[in-house]
């Protein structure tokens, strides 16, 4: 696995996350990113895990990278992205839905569906929209999605965590 960063920082201010400390978002030059990705593709690296905190926070950046890996797919390399599902745009969904099965996988941080918890941790998320987007992507049967929860957040007890688990489980991600 290659851990790879095409941007640094996060546009969100979730109180539990260390990424919220750095308020600046910085993006690497896309020509350099493409050159480095091509090196990984040429060398048939099995997986490139983007560690960008919210890969799709800048639409043009995400689209350029996703187009590039689609156009240069070697049939082997898999790319992993952490995304905010509720801010994915229709053209992004269309692009990734047309990729070969296994080319990309998405990690979607839900953290909790408890509204008191979400409010307390300053998490901006529309869970209904997350459900809609995850369901749309699942329909294509080509993208592995895993959705994350965090146990122990403020206002989260065992019962509310069970509810968050059930809410996410019902969406049927490949991994929870």
State each model region's role.
Residues 45, 173-176:
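Proline-aspartate-enriched helix->loop->beta-strand connector
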Residues 1-139, 151:
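Radical SAM [4Fe-4S] cluster-binding motif and immediate context
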């Amino acid at each position: 696995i290659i851990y790879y960063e095409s941007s640094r920082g996060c546009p969100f201010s979730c109180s539990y996350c260390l990424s919220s400390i750095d308020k600046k978002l910085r993006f690497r030059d896309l020509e350099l990113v493409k050159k480095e990705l091509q090196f990984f593709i040429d060398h048939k690296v099995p997986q490139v895990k983007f560690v960008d905190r919210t890969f799709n926070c800048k639409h043009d950046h995400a689209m350029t990278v996703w187009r590039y890996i689609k156009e240069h797919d070697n049939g082997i390399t898999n790319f992993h992205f952490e995304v905010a599902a509720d801010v994915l745009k229709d053209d992004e969904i269309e692009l990734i839905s047309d990729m070969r099965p296994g080319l990309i996988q998405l990690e979607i941080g839900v953290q909790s569906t408890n509204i008191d918890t979400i409010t307390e941790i300053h998490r901006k998320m529309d869970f209904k929209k997350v459900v809609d987007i995850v369901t749309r992507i699942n329909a294509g049967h080509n993208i592995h999605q895993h959705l994350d929860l965090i146990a122990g957040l403020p206002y989260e007890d065992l019962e509310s965590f069970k509810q968050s688990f059930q809410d996410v489980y019902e969406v049927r991600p490949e991994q929870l």
